């Protein structure tokens, strides 16, 4: 009988070490003096700088990127999907006013491809730089029998900090407040299962096909990274009181905005922005009902802020100074803790 090794059973420890070597330089770009120990150890060490805080509150979030992975897999392009992963986590941290501190990742694969994982982590590092947080560690798990060769999944975990008295939870939102929408970069990381079904099956589109309306291939459009809103919003928080914020993810504006509304108020949205072409294409190709579009996709608005009317112009001016398009898209009125969309 031949000797049996871990590698023969489907787990290549040497490939895992190769991944660490490949990603080290990218990860180190994200580190700051607060990181006492990053990748390579059993755990990461982060020294919380409480200067400027009276009662610092740690905020945590975890997320993934759903079936956007299938687009990356089909195209063999993995260098931007890590940006999406960071965006999904740090944008959620941001909704309560938290500054992201550090990020960790989990990558699970059927068969480890060091180059593929290195590309994934490269994107994560890029996202962390954009969010001004440190990529302090992660886990790469090779699991033959759980995943088929070529299949993989990723998850991200983030921690941020906010002053307790400055937590933004929507509790002060009242009738008369104004809703500001900040543009998305496209489909972001939600609704890809519906998009794939509508475009690739119903519409018979191909990911490599050039689409005139986009000026790029369909696959490139779908892989456009999720926008990270951290820097402009943290800057805005120093100038304007923000009463509530929502990251528009799965469920769209319809399901996400009510999460920050107090009882007895509702959000009335007027669609005065140009809905991105990708959503129009999905709707047409799949004959997707309009109500389903609004409950699945961001429809061009990736992040929402609620401010009092007197602060609207300053808020929009600040956001646009970072080259983030922003509009007044609605108002808060007395009502039933819901969203009403007027097209």
Curated annotation (Swiss-Prot):
It catalyses: 2-formamido-N(1)-(5-O-phospho-beta-D-ribosyl)acetamidine + ATP = 5-amino-1-(5-phospho-beta-D-ribosyl)imidazole + ADP + phosphate + H(+). The keyword Disulfide bond does not apply. InterPro entries: PurM-like_C_dom, PurM-like_C_sf, PurM-like_N, PurM-like_N_sf, PurM_cligase. GO terms for biological process: 'de novo' IMP biosynthetic process; adenine biosynthetic process. It comes from the Bacteria. One of its GO terms (molecular function) is ATP binding. CDD domains: PurM. The keyword Chloroplast does not apply. Pathway: Purine metabolism; IMP biosynthesis via de novo pathway; 5-amino-1-(5-phospho-D-ribosyl)imidazole from N(2)-formyl-N(1)-(5-phospho-D-ribosyl)glycinamide: step 2/2. Its EC number is 6.3.3.1. It is found in: Cytoplasm. It is an enzyme of class 6 (ligase). NCBIfam families: purM. Belongs to the AIR synthase family. HAMAP family: AIRS (MF_00741). This is Phosphoribosylformylglycinamidine cyclo-ligase.
């Amino acid at each position: 009988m031949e000797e049996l090794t871990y590698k023969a059973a489907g787990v290549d420890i040497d490939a895992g070490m190769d991944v660490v070597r490949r990603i080290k330089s990218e990860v180190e770009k994200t580190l700051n003096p607060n990181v006492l120990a990053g990748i390579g150890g059993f755990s990461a060490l982060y020294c919380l700088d409480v200067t400027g805080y009276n009662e610092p509150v740690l905020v945590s979030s975890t997320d993934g990127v759903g079936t956007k992975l299938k687009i990356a897999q089909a195209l063999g392009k993995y260098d931007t999907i890590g940006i999406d992963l960071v965006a999904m986590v740090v944008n959620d941290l941001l909704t309560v006013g938290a500054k992201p501190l550090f990020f960790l990742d989990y990558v699970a694969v059927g068969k480890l491809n060091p180059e593929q994982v290195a590309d994934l982590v490269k994107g994560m590092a890029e996202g962390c730089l954009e969010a001004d947080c440190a990529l302090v560690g992660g886990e790469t798990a090779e699991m033959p029998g759980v995943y088929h060769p070529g299949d993989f999944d990723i998850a991200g975990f983030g921690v941020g900090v906010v002053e307790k008295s400055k937590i933004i939870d929507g509790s002060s939102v009242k009738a008369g407040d104004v809703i500001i929408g900040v543009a998305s970069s496209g489909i972001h990381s939600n609704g890809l299962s519906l998009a794939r079904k509508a475009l690739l099956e119903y519409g018979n589109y191909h990911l490599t096909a050039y689409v005139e309306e986009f000026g790029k291939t369909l696959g490139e459009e779908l892989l456009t990274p999720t926008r990270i809103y951290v820097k402009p919003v943290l800057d805005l928080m120093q100038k304007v009181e923000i009463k509530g914020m929502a990251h528009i993810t799965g469920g769209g504006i319809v399901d996400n905005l009510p999460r920050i509304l107090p009882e007895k108020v509702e959000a009335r949205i007027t669609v005065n922005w140009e809905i991105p072409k990708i959503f129009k294409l999905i709707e047409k190709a799949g004959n997707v009902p309009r109500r389903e579009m609004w409950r699945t996709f961001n429809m061009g608005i990736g992040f929402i802020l609620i401010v009092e009317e007197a602060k609207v112009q300053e808020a929009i001016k600040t956001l646009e100074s970072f080259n983030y398009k922003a509009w007044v898209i609605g108002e808060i009125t007395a009502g039933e803790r819901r969203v009403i969309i007027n097209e």
